[in-house]
Every structure is written in C-alpha cells, then in structure tokens.
C-alpha cells in the first residue's frame, strides 16, 4: 500500500475517527531534465544576486512582497511562522451540503481517507449517512503548514475521499468575462444541437480518454534510446471550413451517427452469434424429441 502523507482524526460532531490520508492522484506527465546541448551535462539553477552578480547562500535569502514596481516589503521566516495555523491533526467537519451546489472550479487535489481498524464502524457510518442523505461534508484541516478548506465525500468501494478546495475569493466569477453578444439560435439549430448532445451521451468511462501525447512521447523516447532514426510526422491536412452553424451541426450529427453504426455493428454481430449458438444448443434436443414422437 502507498505511504500515508498525513495522519490525524476526522471529527463528526463528537465522533472522532482516526484516519490516514493517501494521495488519490499520481500524475504521469513525462518529465525532462535540462541539459547542455554541447556535452549533455545537467544544467544547475543557482540563486544569483542581480546587483552583486554572485551566488547567494540560502540562509541569506528572505521573502519579499512587491507593493509597487521595484519596491518590496521583506518578511522573515519567523514572522511567517507566527501566523502558521496550529497543527490540530484533525479534519473538522462543519457543514453538509449538496455536491451539485459546489462549482468544480473549487476543487484542487484529491486524497483518500483510511480509518484505523478500531474506527472502521464509525467511518462506515459516516459514509453510509452521507450516501443516504445525498450530501458531502465541508471541513477544514491543517495540511503541512496551511489550513485547507476540504470536501469529504463518499467514494467507490465504501471509501471516503477528501478534496482540498479553493477559497471563495480565489474563484473568478464568469460575470467578469467580456462575452460577445450572441444572436438567438433558431429552433432548427437548437433541435440539431440537442440531437447531437443526445447522440454523444453515455456513461462516463475515463479509460476511453488516454493521454495520447504522453504515449507518443514515451514511444519516441524508447525508439531514440534504441538508436532508431526518427522522422518528423507530416502535418495533418486542415479540415474543410464550415461556414454555417447549421451545416456544422448537420455534419456533426452525421459523423455521430456513423460512429454509432460502427459501434453497433460488432454488437449486432455478437448478438447474432449468441442467438445462433443458443439455437444450436436448444434446437437439437427439440428435434430429437420430435423425431422420437414420430417414431412412437
């Protein structure tokens, strides 16, 4: 099992549930190091003073907040540590709300909460209660040196998930956007758009959306490591420009129908094979019984 990154307690009223926190997401981004193209040596980043033009030791570096162009207010580590929240080692639940009330823009990182064996019943009780009520919990927790706003919610397999959240004043309102004025869609355009949405609707299956760029980059790295010659791929031709919104919707609907037919064809074939197999297994006994009746 992965290593816990935090341990403490999940508090629910007067109920105290000892838990450990595990990362729920592991990014698989392809990471590169910076190298000198002449000799392949690693590039080092150093703390360099722009005035004295020399490297500065870490102990002589302070944090500065720019209050006006070129003017900074410096703050020491000790001054900042005085404002660090007290590490209470608790995820304290304050409220229960509908998940649909929370804009996805609020969510940051995701984790799993795992209880101690002694608290398994209380952990399940909280999860079952939230599932039955259709609610999620809003909580606060001190993770590292920051007090985080959190959402605790039921997850698959009876687990509880915790997502850290942005604060309200960190979310930009869509009202601040300068959206261009749009004309009223025609009833035909709206009908075709609704048909397109319906034709592309289905269950969320995240495995259908792999990171193709990452796969291609890893393949490129593997081929270069094996000494294979690499040719730059030819640019894909641009698609024909569609001028009319109605034409674009119509073409999209046609493409969606073709895709649906391609997916349906194997399914129809599988159903035909299954029906034929069933007929073979069930038809023979019937035929045998019929022939026996005739002989009798």
UniProtKB/Swiss-Prot annotation:
The keyword DNA-binding applies. It holds the Pfam family Ku. SMART domains: Ku78. Residues 11-187 form the Ku domain. Residues 286-296 have a biased composition (Basic residues). GO terms for biological process: DNA recombination; double-strand break repair via nonhomologous end joining. GO terms for molecular function: double-stranded DNA binding. Residues 275-285 have a biased composition (Low complexity). Residues 258-273 have a biased composition (Basic and acidic residues). Residues 254-296 are annotated as: Disordered. Keywords: DNA damage, DNA recombination, DNA repair, DNA-binding. Gene3D superfamilies: 2.40.290.10. The keyword Transferase does not apply. NCBIfam families: Ku_bact. Homodimer. Interacts with LigD. Belongs to the prokaryotic Ku family. With LigD forms a non-homologous end joining (NHEJ) DNA repair enzyme, which repairs dsDNA breaks with reduced fidelity. Binds linear dsDNA with 5'- and 3'- overhangs but not closed circular dsDNA nor ssDNA. Recruits and stimulates the ligase activity of LigD. This is Non-homologous end joining protein Ku. The gene is ku.
